[in-house]
UniProtKB/Swiss-Prot annotation:
Residues 13-36 have a biased composition (Low complexity). This is Putative adhesin P1-like protein MPN_131. Residues 130-139 have a biased composition (Basic and acidic residues). It comes from the Bacteria. Belongs to the adhesin P1 family. Signal peptide: none annotated. Residues 37-48, 149-160, 174-183 have a biased composition (Polar residues). Residues 13-51, 90-183 are annotated as: Disordered.
Length: 221
């Protein structure tokens, strides 16, 4: 989600200014300014943000295709050959040569309020109003093109689904002292499993409580 922070409110790909620099497709200098920006054009404040994002993504994934979420459930992530952010922006320098560090480009990052923007409705700061990009890979090569349909669309609407919590985690909503589970209108497998786990736990609790105490007053396991 952080991938869209630099564009909020301006609709340009590299700017934090009222209009930003849209001429940074040729790369940026070590000072962070666009090489072909005119003297009256604001410097692209976030022109090097891709470096930090790439380091963060690589450090998080560590070459693995999965990473655990807070519940410890494996969460599918993007592989190393296609480290596209789900918001569809790709990397920031717009270079298309594989010899470049961040060679993946993006087809558009311009909101509908921009004169070169999307034909869809919404403001320039709304990620879903940006043109959708489609990322495809062949081996280690990645191509990103503007897309209107397909399975590889990458924007907020097409975010990957989140993994549901383990069914046993759902039993926390039930009190351990209840004798009947609360009614559930859902018949999905996860809810059924949660109800089943609840019944087993309650059954064990009742079974233990019916065992007569031993001579010293303790209930055997």
């Amino acid at each position: 989600m952080l991938d869209y922070v630099p564009w909020i409110g301006n609709g340009y790909r590299y700017g934090n200014n009222h209009r930003g620099s849209n001429s940074s497709t040729s790369g940026v200098t070590t000072q962070g300014q666009s090489q072909n920006a005119s003297s009256n054009e604001p410097a692209p404040t976030f022109s090097n943000v891709g470096v930090g994002l790439k380091a963060n993504v690589n450090g998080t994934l560590s070459g693995s295709r999965t990473t655990p979420n807070q519940q410890g459930t494996p969460w599918l992530t993007l592989d190393q050959a296609n480290l596209q952010l789900w918001t569809g922006a790709g990397w920031r320098n717009d270079k298309n040569g594989q010899s470049d560090e961040n060679y993946t480009n993006f087809a558009s990052a311009k909101g509908s309020t921009n004169q070169q923007g999307s034909t869809t409705g919404g403001s320039a700061g709304n990620p879903d109003s940006l043109k959708q990009d489609k990322a495809d890979k062949s081996g280690d090569s990645v191509t990103v093109a503007e897309a209107t349909s397909g399975d590889n669309l990458t924007n907020y609407t097409n975010l990957p689904p989140t993994s549901p919590p383990h069914p046993t985690d759902r039993t926390r909503c039930h009190s351990p002292t209840r004798t009947t589970p609360s009614g559930c209108s859902c018949s999905c497998a996860a809810c059924w499993a949660a109800s089943r786990c609840w019944s087993i736990r309650v059954g064990k609790m009742i079974t233990v409580s019916l065992i007569p105490p031993t001579k010293n007053g303790l209930t055997p396991n």
